[in-house]
């Protein structure tokens, strides 16, 4: 080459870095956002817009954040940011759940239980300090994820104002008639020393003993007569029960049957030499008798369970205790014997059926529930023959009771079985039902269950199956046990009558007065309060309740304790948490909301799945497959983590591994490189001076704006329905196919070789400007740091941050009367693929080195040929080939052929043209390049 024409080319130039270097750049951006008060600016910029309130479910203030936290917070952040771009004011107030047992345990490990080194007030203060420290640690990591919010003013359930508002919320619940007190069986953790709510229970496999125990009939002849049978002399009758909790037998007060179940009177094993007939459900008789070593089923009569109602049995080892036969809906013929031993102190159904029959009034509290809060039998528990039970822990009592019953004739069978059993979610230890005095929110007393089920129907659930799931849980759940016998929490600030146990008739008024004091001095005010200050002369007749509220009540009333205080409306637009929260926060919020306002506290409810490894296994330290968000941010950056979360199907389990992270890093590079190429080609472009109107653009440029418009409509709709995976996929496809494989490739010629200010070049830059303006907004909710960086490099005048803008309004579809319609472009792109297929073997066999060395002939039917012939001169730019000829042929198909060109190559544009050398001043250039350098420049209409 005799002359160097490089200086005449307009090659891409940008300072936007090729490498993201996110672990270094992101912290600097965070510092700037913090320094400039970014969240406050964002809210101020959005003032006056319609509100969209995503109410934050509070994480527990204990321990470092994990991957599940990151998923939750980033999903929320994507939604909040997309709402700002959609023209909303979307305040985000993060919160923390600060009371409860895990924090108590942490303080107990250091200082011992209350009363050892610290009194209750000092203990609560240490809990408060610990929770505050944990919040600071978690807040730092949440901010590092790129999550925007009012981090300087979060809501915390330990704040005096919140604690006061929680007591005010309780007053509304009381006022509406939902609070009740009673001795009921509740889930009890012996390690916690407290009742547990449904949401605090998880199920795990446990090996339990199974026993079949015979309850002898007091009047065997009467039982036989109910079956239409005559009992021979010397034959006994018994009703066997099957249970996995032998420890509950000392509390057994009845045996329940199914009213409509069919029972048979069958010959059973002898009782120490005496013949014995047994009452067993017909469907279970053969199986039960086989357990007892009886092969043949010899039936002496049939009867419905209802025929045996109120007949009396003997307790298997407390002979003086008469055991009535009751009827219960909970009895089935699925397993066991069809007869259920009934201990009202240790089971919900047992309690209900016993209450129905008035059984509870016949026995004292120690007989109904002989087990204390540590899981030990009370001193008053009678012995089993010569075997003492008092002081024995129930888990040890199982084997002791079984051994003591051997040889007595009542133990028909004993074995072991593994089954799913409720455990404490904190201690991972088995729990038990214990009847204790507790405070409940009744599901029936003021129609809470029916109202809640109705409210569920008015909520939009994502995914849709969430509606049936939570409805099933609410429909079948027991009353909500809201009292806890612990120290660190919000007190149930009620005064109850010393004799009747009834709450003071002015309870709601008194609760509000207590709340006013708590707002000034915290919950300690309740414990130091002299009752006479509020009750005057009545104080001697009343005592203060020292139980605290369930932590699920704490978080469940945040809609009442937080939103009105912050000037935000109820119900919130959206609650978003993990799928376990149908039985947790979603449900506690629903029940409290309906109890207070007869409405759900949210309009929409979205759930996400749990994180697992690439094999679908739960992440854990023991498996060594855990991936911490902090490590991802240190090595790859928060935007890579955010991209993975957005691209995953969060409605199911979300798989993560190093390989998956690598794939997301590759996808990120594709997006970043696209942005960099756009910026590089916008070098020297000023939209105020150079922007070409849409109707004046080269048609290929107009087409890419059309494609961007269609994509934006798709993206905006997907953000609105929270389908982030579709957005990521659509973006990557647009970058790879529409831009990477086509538009950016085709327009290089115009951008590089045309005169700097040529309309064809400015047209391409204008299209790229429109695409870049839209692109930065599309990625902003997901790739927050990268979008901010890209925003700072865009040409033209802009607001300070991309989130101060809204979805880009500079895009538009191709008009229906365009010289080339969208359908025309679709056909041309199919033709372009045909050309590529024809050229591929020519490249392979060495006939050509590049597509520019091939001349193309397109043969089509007359109508198609006539449509495309005006484009023929520019089709070579679309195909990035040598000259293109379009001919009419008598065929319905389109045929493409190619041959190597014999024309000289222009050293500047690399096209092979007959005009190369036609200008003696530039013997190595084609006439087009000469015109672009020195003349008026070429004109383009199509491509």
UniProtKB/Swiss-Prot annotation:
<feature type="binding site">
    <location>
        <position position="621"/>
    </location>
    <ligand>
        <name>ATP</name>
    </ligand>
</feature>
<dbReference type="InterPro" id="IPR033708">
    <property type="entry name" value="Anticodon_Ile_BEm"/>
</dbReference>
<comment type="subunit">
    <text>Monomer.</text>
</comment>
<dbReference type="GO" id="GO:0002161">
    <property type="term" value="F:aminoacyl-tRNA deacylase activity"/>
</dbReference>
<dbReference type="InterPro" id="IPR010663">
    <property type="entry name" value="Znf_FPG/IleRS"/>
</dbReference>
<dbReference type="GO" id="GO:0000049">
    <property type="term" value="F:tRNA binding"/>
</dbReference>
<dbReference type="InterPro" id="IPR002300">
    <property type="entry name" value="aa-tRNA-synth_Ia"/>
</dbReference>
<keyword id="KW-0648">Protein biosynthesis</keyword>
<dbReference type="GO" id="GO:0005829">
    <property type="term" value="C:cytosol"/>
</dbReference>
<comment type="similarity">
    <text>Belongs to the class-I aminoacyl-tRNA synthetase family. IleS type 1 subfamily.</text>
</comment>
<dbReference type="GO" id="GO:0006428">
    <property type="term" value="P:isoleucyl-tRNA aminoacylation"/>
</dbReference>
<dbReference type="InterPro" id="IPR050081">
    <property type="entry name" value="Ile-tRNA_ligase"/>
</dbReference>
<feature type="binding site">
    <location>
        <position position="577"/>
    </location>
    <ligand>
        <name>L-isoleucyl-5'-AMP</name>
    </ligand>
</feature>
<comment type="function">
    <text>Catalyzes the attachment of isoleucine to tRNA(Ile). As IleRS can inadvertently accommodate and process structurally similar amino acids such as valine, to avoid such errors it has two additional distinct tRNA(Ile)-dependent editing activities. One activity is designated as 'pretransfer' editing and involves the hydrolysis of activated Val-AMP. The other activity is designated 'posttransfer' editing and involves deacylation of mischarged Val-tRNA(Ile).</text>
</comment>
<dbReference type="GO" id="GO:0008270">
    <property type="term" value="F:zinc ion binding"/>
</dbReference>
<dbReference type="GO" id="GO:0005524">
    <property type="term" value="F:ATP binding"/>
</dbReference>
<feature type="binding site">
    <location>
        <position position="909"/>
    </location>
    <ligand>
        <name>Zn(2+)</name>
    </ligand>
</feature>
<dbReference type="InterPro" id="IPR009080">
    <property type="entry name" value="tRNAsynth_Ia_anticodon-bd"/>
</dbReference>
<feature type="binding site">
    <location>
        <position position="906"/>
    </location>
    <ligand>
        <name>Zn(2+)</name>
    </ligand>
</feature>
<keyword id="KW-0030">Aminoacyl-tRNA synthetase</keyword>
<dbReference type="InterPro" id="IPR013155">
    <property type="entry name" value="M/V/L/I-tRNA-synth_anticd-bd"/>
</dbReference>
<feature type="short sequence motif" description="'HIGH' region">
    <location>
        <begin position="59"/>
        <end position="69"/>
    </location>
</feature>
<dbReference type="Pfam" id="PF08264">
    <property type="entry name" value="Anticodon_1"/>
</dbReference>
<dbReference type="InterPro" id="IPR014729">
    <property type="entry name" value="Rossmann-like_a/b/a_fold"/>
</dbReference>
<keyword id="KW-0862">Zinc</keyword>
<dbReference type="InterPro" id="IPR001412">
    <property type="entry name" value="aa-tRNA-synth_I_CS"/>
</dbReference>
<keyword id="KW-0436">Ligase</keyword>
<feature type="short sequence motif" description="'KMSKS' region">
    <location>
        <begin position="618"/>
        <end position="622"/>
    </location>
</feature>
<keyword id="KW-0963">Cytoplasm</keyword>
<dbReference type="InterPro" id="IPR009008">
    <property type="entry name" value="Val/Leu/Ile-tRNA-synth_edit"/>
</dbReference>
<keyword id="KW-0547">Nucleotide-binding</keyword>
<dbReference type="Pfam" id="PF00133">
    <property type="entry name" value="tRNA-synt_1"/>
</dbReference>
<keyword id="KW-0479">Metal-binding</keyword>
<feature type="binding site">
    <location>
        <position position="929"/>
    </location>
    <ligand>
        <name>Zn(2+)</name>
    </ligand>
</feature>
<protein>
    <recommendedName>
        <fullName>Isoleucine--tRNA ligase</fullName>
        <ecNumber>6.1.1.5</ecNumber>
    </recommendedName>
</protein>
<dbReference type="Pfam" id="PF06827">
    <property type="entry name" value="zf-FPG_IleRS"/>
</dbReference>
<dbReference type="InterPro" id="IPR023585">
    <property type="entry name" value="Ile-tRNA-ligase_type1"/>
</dbReference>
<feature type="binding site">
    <location>
        <position position="926"/>
    </location>
    <ligand>
        <name>Zn(2+)</name>
    </ligand>
</feature>
<dbReference type="GO" id="GO:0004822">
    <property type="term" value="F:isoleucine-tRNA ligase activity"/>
</dbReference>
<keyword id="KW-0067">ATP-binding</keyword>
<dbReference type="InterPro" id="IPR002301">
    <property type="entry name" value="Ile-tRNA-ligase"/>
</dbReference>
């Amino acid at each position: 080459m005799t002359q160097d024409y490089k200086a005449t080319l307009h090659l891409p130039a940008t300072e936007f870095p090729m490498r993201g270097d996110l672990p270094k750049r992101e912290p600097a951006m965070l510092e700037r956002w913090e320094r400039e008060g970014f969240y406050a600016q964002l809210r101020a910029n959005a003032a006056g817009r319609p509100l969209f309130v995503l109410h934050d479910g509070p994480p527990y203030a204990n321990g470092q954040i994990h991957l599940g936290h990151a998923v939750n917070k980033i999903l929320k952040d994507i939604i909040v940011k997309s709402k700002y771009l959609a023209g909303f004011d979307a305040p985000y107030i993060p919160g923390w759940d600060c009371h409860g047992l895990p924090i108590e345990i942490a303080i107990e490990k250091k200082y011992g239980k209350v009363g050892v080194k610290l009194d209750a007030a000092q203990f609560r203060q240490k809990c408060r300090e610990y929770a505050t420290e944990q919040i600071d640690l978690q807040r730092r990591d949440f901010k590092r994820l790129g999550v925007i919010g009012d981090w300087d003013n979060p809501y915390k359930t330990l704040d005096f104002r919140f604690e006061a508002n929680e007591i005010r919320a309780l007053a509304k619940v009381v006022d509406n008639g939902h609070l009740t007190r009673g001795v009921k069986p509740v889930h009890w953790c012996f390690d916690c020393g407290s009742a547990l709510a449904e949401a605090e229970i998880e199920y795990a496999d446990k090996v339990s003993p199974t026993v079949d125990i015979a309850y002898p009939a007091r009047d065997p002849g009467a039982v036989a007569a109910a079956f239409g049978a005559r009992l021979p002399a010397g034959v006994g009758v018994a009703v066997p029960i099957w249970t996995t909790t032998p420890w509950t037998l000392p509390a057994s007060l009845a045996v329940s049957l199914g009213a409509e179940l069919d029972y048979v009177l069958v010959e059973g094993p002898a009782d120490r030499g005496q013949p014995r007939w047994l009452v067993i459900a017909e469907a279970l008789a053969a199986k039960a008798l086989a357990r007892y070593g009886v092969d043949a089923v010899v039936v002496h009569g049939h009867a419905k369970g209802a025929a045996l109602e109120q007949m009396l049995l003997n307790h298997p080892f407390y002979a003086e205790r008469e055991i009535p036969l009751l009827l219960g809906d909970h009895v089935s013929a699925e397993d066991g014997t069809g007869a259920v031993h009934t201990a009202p102190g240790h089971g919900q159904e047992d309690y209900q059926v016993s209450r129905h029959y008035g059984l509870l009034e016949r026995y004292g509290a120690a007989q109904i529930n002989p087990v204390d809060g540590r899981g030990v039998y009370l001193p008053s528990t009678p012995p089993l023959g010569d075997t003492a039970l008092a002081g024995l822990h129930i888990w040890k009592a199982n084997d002791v009771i079984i051994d003591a019953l051997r040889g007595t004739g009542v133990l028909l069978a004993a074995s072991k079985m593994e089954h799913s059993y409720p455990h404490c979610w904190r201690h991972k230890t088995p729990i038990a039902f214990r009847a204790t005095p507790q405070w409940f929110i009744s599901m029936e007393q003021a129609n809470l269950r029916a109202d809640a089920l109705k409210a569920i129907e008015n909520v939009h659930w994502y995914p849709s199956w969430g509606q049936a799931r939570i409805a099933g849980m609410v429909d079948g759940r027991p009353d909500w046990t809201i009292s806890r016998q612990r120290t660190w929490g919000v007190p149930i600030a009620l005064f109850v009558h010393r004799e009747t146990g009834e709450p003071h008739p002015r309870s709601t008024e008194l609760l509000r007065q207590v709340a006013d004091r708590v707002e000034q001095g915290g919950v300690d005010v309740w414990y130091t309060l002299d009752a006479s200050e509020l009750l005057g002369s009545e104080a001697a007749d009343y005592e203060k309740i020292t139980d605290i509220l369930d932590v699920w009540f704490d978080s469940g009333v945040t809609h009442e304790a937080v939103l009105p205080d912050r000037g935000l409306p109820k119900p919130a637009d959206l609650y978003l948490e993990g799928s376990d929260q149908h039985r947790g926060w979603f449900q506690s919020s629903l029940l409290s909301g309906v109890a207070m306002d007869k409405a759900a506290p949210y309009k929409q409810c979205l759930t996400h799945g749990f994180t697992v490894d690439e094999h679908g296994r739960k992440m854990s330290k023991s498996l060594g497959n855990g991936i911490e968000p902090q490590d991802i941010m240190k090595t790859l950056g928060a935007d890579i983590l955010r991209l993975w979360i957005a691209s995953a199907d969060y409605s199911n389990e979300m798989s993560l591994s190093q390989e998956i992270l690598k794939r997301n890093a590759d996808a990120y590079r594709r997006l970043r490189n696209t942005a960099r190429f756009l910026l590089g080609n916008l070098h020297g472009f000023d939209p105020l001076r150079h922007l070409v109107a849409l109707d004046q653009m080269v048609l290929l440029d107009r087409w890419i704006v059309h494609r961007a418009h269609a994509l934006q409509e798709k993206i905006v709709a997907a953000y609105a329905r929270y389908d982030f995976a579709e957005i990521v996929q659509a973006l990557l496809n647009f970058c790879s196919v529409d831009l990477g494989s086509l538009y950016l490739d085709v327009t290089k010629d115009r951008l590089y070789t045309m005169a700097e200010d040529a309309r064809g070049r400015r047209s391409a830059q204008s299209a790229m400007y429109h695409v870049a303006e839209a692109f930065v907004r599309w990625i902003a909710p997901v790739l927050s740091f990268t979008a901010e960086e890209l925003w700072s490099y865009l040409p033209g005048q802009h607001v300070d941050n991309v989130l101060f803008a809204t979805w880009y309004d500079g895009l538009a579809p191709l008009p229906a009367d365009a010289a080339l319609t969208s359908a025309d472009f679709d056909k041309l792109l199919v033709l372009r693929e045909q050309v590529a297929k024809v050229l591929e073997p020519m490249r392979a066999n060495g006939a050509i080195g590049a597509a520019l060395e091939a001349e193309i002939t397109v043969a089509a039917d007359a109508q198609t040929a006539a449509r495309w012939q005006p484009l023929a001169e520019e089709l070579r730019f679309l195909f990035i080939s040598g000259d293109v000829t379009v001919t009419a042929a008598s065929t319905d198909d389109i045929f493409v052929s190619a041959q190597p060109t014999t024309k000289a190559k222009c050293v500047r544009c690399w096209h092979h043209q007959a005009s190369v050398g036609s200008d003696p001043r530039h013997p190595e250039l084609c006439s087009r390049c000469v015109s672009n350098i020195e003349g008026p420049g070429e004109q383009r209409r199509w491509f």
